[in-house]
From Swiss-Prot:
Family: Belongs to the DnaA family.
Assembly description: Oligomerizes as a right-handed, spiral filament on DNA at oriC.
Binding-site list for ATP: G176, G178, K179, T180
A GO CC annotation given for this chain: plasma membrane
CDD domains: AAA, Bac_DnaA_C
Location of this chain's protein in the cell: Cytoplasm
Record-linked Gene3D superfamilies: 1.10.1750.10, 1.10.8.60, 3.30.300.180, P-loop containing nucleotide triphosphate hydrolases
Protein name listed in UniProt: Chromosomal replication initiator protein DnaA
The keyword ATP-binding is annotated on this UniProt entry: yes
Protein species of origin: Vibrio vulnificus (strain CMCP6)
GO function terms (MF aspect): ATP binding; ATP hydrolysis activity; DNA replication origin binding; lipid binding
Ranges for region Disordered: 81-113
Gene: dnaA
Domain III, AAA+ region as annotated region, ranges: 132-348
Amino acid sequence: MSSSLWLQCMQRLQEELPATEFSMWVRPLQAELNDNTLTLFAPNRFVLDWVRDKYLNSINRLLQEYCGHDIPNLRFEVGSRPVAAPKPAPTRTPADVAAESSAPAQLQARKPVHKTWDDDAQAIADINHRSNVNPKHKFNNFVEGKSNQLGLAAARQVADNPGGAYNPLFLYGGTGLGKTHLLHAVGNAIVDNKPNAKVVYMHSERFVQDMVKALQNNAIEEFKRYYRSVDALLIDDIQFFANKERSQEEFFHTFNALLEGNQQIILTSDRYPKEISGVEDRLKSRFGWGLTVAIEPPELETRVAILMKKAEDHQIHLADEVAFFIAKRLRSNVRELEGALNRVIANANFTGRPITIDFVREALRDLLALQEKLVTIDNIQKTVAEYYKIKVADLLSKRRSRSVARPRQLAMALAKELTNHSLPEIGDAFGGRDHTTVLHACRKIEQLREESHDIKEDYSNLIRTLSS
């Protein structure tokens, strides 16, 4: 076997792989054939691990095709091919000369690289170049409701047409409302539609960690090429970029490169883009270039539907009245609902008792007691007054100025949503008002949440504060 073996393999790989993929991962490799062992040298651990993970089978297939049973052993190393000791020049045929003169630079002798790689850091090997998309989170097991309807519709559109009109897609809302589920659902749908698509999901802190490792190990160019070569980049909790200036700088350029290439970006945050503190204005501006959608806390009907769906997944019968009992008392987010249901199911399995309202009340007694203690009308009034920088006495007064009337209506709507008090009881707690006044306030706030971004934001922020 001659030194042209790897050249032949490279030529075939160049035919089989997309041009950018070949240039990024295969072209940088150097080769050395010695004692029936073919050693491939990668410039850093990141490239080495990627090649071994993605192309090992293809390389072995080509070696077997060219060598038959005399296939060489294959090794990978980080560094450059060492300079061979001088040997007497052998007699070469014109064909040998032509083959060697046409060999790429990767097969020519270079000075050895003496860089040592820290075993703990493992260079850039820890960069997670797998998709990380959770196959369990799909559109068909996402429970749709009024609170997430627009977000779900936007996510479906993006999955059907990645890199299209909604780029970037920015989903925001409190913890446990389904933003991460939607990210994974989009990723799964894109891959289902196009199996070769390169879709990467990650938490924003992972991006920061990868960048730091790339900087530490002189692999920033590989880092850039990797992140800018994806078909869809899905980043959770973008607010964790706050005050990380170098990460923001790198993400800014990555963001621009992906948008210019019509590659899809989806971001999530716990707040509206312009309200993320510690993030540069130029980034916050770009976050809003596509479509920004709020994911709201689920309303009662959606909470019930979520519980019924999860019970069905566990092959557990959950009576409607039991689902309503739980949903009326746990209002903050989907994660809390699922946790409560898991607890109820576990208790039922341990005791062998049927799941009734009395059983649920017993199984969740500490959680329900905590909720009732935290969310009272008094607590709502104090929280709303503090939020709008007015006095609780203003909420109870007869004043009708908008600066007081609107917070009062919000507080009434929150009392109806977050407590089990009747409309007359809520009216009494707000200065002896009639129950029709409370009903009007609830309907008005529901209407304004559809029409006014500010009211929608205020309502979500107050729900999150009162339910946490």
